[in-house]
Structures are given as structure tokens and as C-alpha cells.
Curated annotation (Swiss-Prot):
Keywords: Isopeptide bond, Transferase, tRNA processing, Ubl conjugation. The keyword Acyltransferase does not apply. It comes from Haloferax volcanii (strain ATCC 29605 / DSM 3757 / JCM 8879 / NBRC 14742 / NCIMB 2012 / VKM B-1768 / DS2). GO terms for cellular component: cytosolic tRNA wobble base thiouridylase complex. This is tRNA 2-thiolation protein NcsA. It comes from the Archaea. Interacts with monomeric and polymeric forms of SAMP2. Interacts with UbaA. Interacts with archaeal EF-1-alpha and Pan1. Non-sampylated protein forms a complex with archaeal CPSF1 of approximately 100 kDa. It is an enzyme of class 2 (transferase).
Length: 321
């Protein structure tokens, strides 16, 4: 199998496009898609300058997606005076798993010479995920606890780091799964929120207010291609599933999508093309509907619809066991 562009041995065949690419042309293709997404989403404001630079905080977990995203962003903007890249890693406290991925984060940040911040659940909340899973006071999946804690720390420390944007390594598979889940739940208001929260053109989004705007530059690249890119570039990615992973519904959607993609190549791209258009339309229709005024949490000061935020209620519940 030869590369369509140069005749060298191909390392991959993209069934959705018919392309056969060698290692160099494949990696260039991934990088091109990430850079195109950055342009199409207008991530870099027109007024960004060396005197008024943007700070982009990257959620760096050490997994393949965030490692590849950080590598490509550094390759693209590492010497651009209009942008400062900062890597933010959250250590949840999962024995035998997170320490290895943190090592990957530290190695990558040192290799790229970018500012790297490490934050732990234990330091910030006085808990570790292993203990939370064992106690499970709310009888919830581990991911339900972890999602609340991670979002809080990413938002809080991105703000402390002066972030203009918070970037995460969600790939095409991740986003197509989320799109299908929103379709199946029939929640158009959630689709509208998705546009303003992370997938919309920045010039068309509603202002994020006190929250850090989010972006997903890797969302046009399939998961397997992200993994292949990490391998070919010999990046220090920790490719192991979290031992507490428990999103059963998303797992079903993942298997459904993989089967559809196998039988009908291009399904994920088609889903996202339609979903992004629908998200923009629903954002115009539902934007602001049901919006509630946010208060400062009585305990930690974070924004919440009630008096005490979800994170603080969970911590109280865990400590009571």
C-alpha cells in the first residue's frame, strides 16, 4: 500500500476519505486539521498581539489526546508572541494510574519548555478518588464525582493562570458520542449550550460571562488517528484506561458508532457536520432561555445556582462517611 502523495509505504488508510498516507503525510494531515479548526472557530482574536497576548491553558492529562494537542499547539504557536501556552494537570489520586500519566505530562512539558501546573484533589479537596470510590456516599458512578471535581479545578486554576481560553483534547469520536447522546435524549437546549460552551465559532458564541471559554481543536481527528500520531511522533503519552471508568451509556454509544463507522465510513464526520449546524440554530433559538442568576457558593465562592455548589455538597457527603 503506497502513499497517495509520495509513493512511500503508507502507514494508514482512512476509509472515510479513501486516502492512503505515509507517516510524514499522515502527521501533516492531522496537524492541518487542528490548525484549520483553530482558524474556523476564530480562536485567535484579531486584536491579539505581542503587547496584548492570549493565554491558552491546555488541560493536559497525559493521555494521548491531550498530549497530541499540546504537541501540535506548541509546534504551531510555541514561538508566536501573541499566544502563551500553559499546561494544567489534575491529579485525582488513583493509585497505579495517575502517577504514570503525570510523569508523561512532566516529560512533555519539559521537552516543549512550556509552563506546567500540577493540581491535586488531595491538596484542594482533602480527598483522593480511590477513597471516594470506596466510600461512594451518593451511590454514584466514579465518573460522576470526578467530573464535578475536575471541572471545578480546571475552571478555577485556568482563571488563576489568567486563561483567555481553556483547551481540551476531545477528539472526533468523543464529540460524535456526545452529539448522539444529546440527540437520543431529545434535549435541544443542551445542544444549544454545547455550541456556546465549546464547539461554536468564537465570533458567534454568547459571551461566557465569568467562565473561561472552552475550545476543542482536536475534534475533527478520529481517536485511532490521534493514537497513531502519538506513536509515530514518539510522544510520552500514557495510554491506559482509568480503572474507575464507568460511563456505561457512553460506552454503548461508542460501540454503536464504531459499528456504524465500520459499515458506513464517514458516519462520525456526517454526524458532527449536521450537529454543528443544528447547534448553531438551536443556540439562536434557545439562547438565554431558562438561564438562572448565579450566586457565589457560601463555602468556596465558586458560581452556583443555589447557596452551596455541587462540589462542596459532595465533599461534605464524603467526609461524613
Amino acid at each position: 500500500m503506497e502513499c497517495d502523495k509520495c509513493g512511500r509505504d503508507a502507514v494508514m488508510h482512512a476509509a472515510y476519505s479513501g486516502a492512503h498516507l505515509c507517516d510524514d503525510h499522515f502527521c501533516a494531515s492531522v496537524e492541518k486539521r487542528v490548525r484549520r479548526r483553530i482558524r474556523e472557530d476564530n480562536m485567535l482574536p484579531r486584536d491579539a498581539s505581542p503587547e496584548n497576548p492570549q493565554t491558552w491553558v491546555i488541560g493536559l492529562s497525559g493521555g494521548k489526546d491531550s498530549v497530541v494537542l499540546t504537541h501540535i499547539l506548541d509546534d504551531t504557536f510555541g514561538r508566536d508572541p501573541r499566544i502563551e501556552l500553559v499546561a494544567l494537570t489534575i491529579h485525582e489520586g488513583i493509585e497505579g494510574y495517575r502517577d504514570k500519566s503525570v510523569d508523561a505530562c512532566v516529560e512533555l512539558a519539559e521537552d516543549l519548555d512550556i509552563h506546567h501546573e500540577l493540581v491535586t484533589y488531595e491538596d484542594e479537596f482533602g480527598v483522593q478518588m480511590d477513597d471516594v470510590v470506596e466510600k461512594d456516599p451518593e451511590n454514584m458512578a466514579a465518573c460522576a464525582y470526578c467530573g464535578v471535581f475536575r471541572r471545578d479545578l480546571l475552571e478555577r486554576f485556568a482563571d488563576e493562570l489568567g486563561a483567555d481560553k481553556l483547551l481540551t483534547g476531545h477528539n472526533l469520536d468523543d464529540e460524535a458520542q456526545t452529539a448522539l447522546m444529546n440527540f437520543f435524549e431529545g434535549d435541544l437546549k443542551q445542544v444549544a449550550k454545547h455550541f456556546d460552551a465549546s464547539i461554536g465559532d468564537f465570533e458567534k458564541r454568547r459571551d461566557a460571562g465569568e467562565f473561561i471559554p472552552r475550545a476543542k481543536p482536536l475534534r475533527d481527528v478520529p481517536e485511532k488517528e490521534v493514537a497513531l500520531y502519538a506513536h509515530l511522533k514518539d510522544l510520552p503519552a500514557h495510554i491506559t484506561e482509568c480503572p474507575h471508568s464507568s460511563e456505561a451509556y457512553r460506552g454503548e454509544i461508542q460501540q454503536l458508532l464504531l459499528k456504524l463507522e465500520e459499515n458506513h465510513p464517514g458516519t462520525r464526520h456526517s454526524i458532527m457536520a449536521g450537529y454543528e449546524e443544528l447547534a448553531e440554530l438551536t443556540a439562536r433559538e434557545y439562547r438565554g432561555e431558562g438561564r438562572v442568576d448565579l450566586n457565589d457558593c457560601e463555602r468556596c465562592g465558586s458560581k452556583t445556582a443555589g447557596d452551596v455548589c455541587r462540589k462542596c455538597r459532595l465533599i461534605e457527603s464524603i467526609e461524613a462517611v
